[in-house]
Regions:
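Kelch-like beta-propeller repeat domains
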Residues: 1-175
Length: 175
C-alpha cells in the first residue's frame, strides 16, 4: 500500500481535514508482518493508477493536495528493502489523477482522469504504453464515444481495453 489520502481525525462531514500520505506499507506473506516505510515518496501522492508487473508495482500519475502528477515510476524490491525506479518508464503526456488503467498484451492503457486539482474536469484522455518499446512513450489513442470520465473502471482483455462507469464532471458536457 503506497501513499493515499484520508480523514484520520474526523469524518469530513464533522469538519475533518484530509491528510495526504507518502508512506509505503509492505506485508510479508512468510512472516505475516507489516513493515512501514515512512516518507517513502518524496511527496505525498494519492489517486494514481497502479499496475502489477513481474518486476514490481508500476505507479502512474496521481495527485497531492494542490496538483496532479505526470510521473510514472516502478517500486521494486531489492534485497531487504524497496526502491523507486523513476527513469525506466516515460512520463504521462499530461498530469492525471483519478484515471483508470489496465494491462493487456504487454500494453498499459490509461483512460480518463483529471489534469488539475483546481477547476476539476473529467477528461477523454486515452493513452497506451507498449512495454516492449517504452522509448516511444505513451501513445495517444482515439477518444471513446460518450462523456469524459474520471473514477472509471478499466479492464484489458488481450488487445482490447474496456471502460466502465465513472463520473463525468466537465462543465460544458451534456450527459
Amino acid at each position: 500500500v503506497l501513499g493515499g489520502a484520508n480523514f484520520p481525525d474526523k469524518y469530513p462531514w464533522e469538519g475533518g481535514t484530509k491528510t495526504w500520505w507518502s508512506t509505503l506499507y509492505s506485508y510479508d506473506l512468510q512472516t505475516g508482518k507489516w513493515t512501514v516505510y515512512d516518507d517513502f515518496l518524496d511527496r505525498p501522492l494519492a489517486y494514481g493508477v497502479s499496475i502489477s508487473l513481474p518486476e514490481g508495482l508500476l505507479c502512474i500519475g496521481g495527485c497531492d493536495r494542490t496538483q496532479c502528477s505526470d510521473n510514472v515510476f516502478l517500486i521494486k524490491k531489492e534485497e531487504d528493502s524497496f526502491v523507486i525506479d523513476s527513469v525506466s518508464y516515460p512520463s504521462l503526456p499530461v498530469p492525471l489523477a483519478n484515471a483508470t488503467g489496465a494491462m493487456g498484451d504487454n500494453c498499459i492503457y490509461i483512460a480518463g482522469g483529471q489534469e488539475t486539482m483546481v477547476n476539476e474536469q473529467s477528461t477523454h484522455h486515452f493513452y497506451m504504453l507498449y512495454l516492449m518499446h517504452k522509448e516511444r512513450g505513451c501513445q495517444e489513442m482515439p477518444d471513446w464515444n460518450g462523456p469524459s470520465l474520471s473514477y472509471a473502471v478499466g479492464v484489458a482483455q488481450g488487445e482490447r481495453f474496456y471502460l466502465f462507469s465513472g463520473r463525468s464532471y466537465a462543465p460544458d458536457e451534456a450527459m
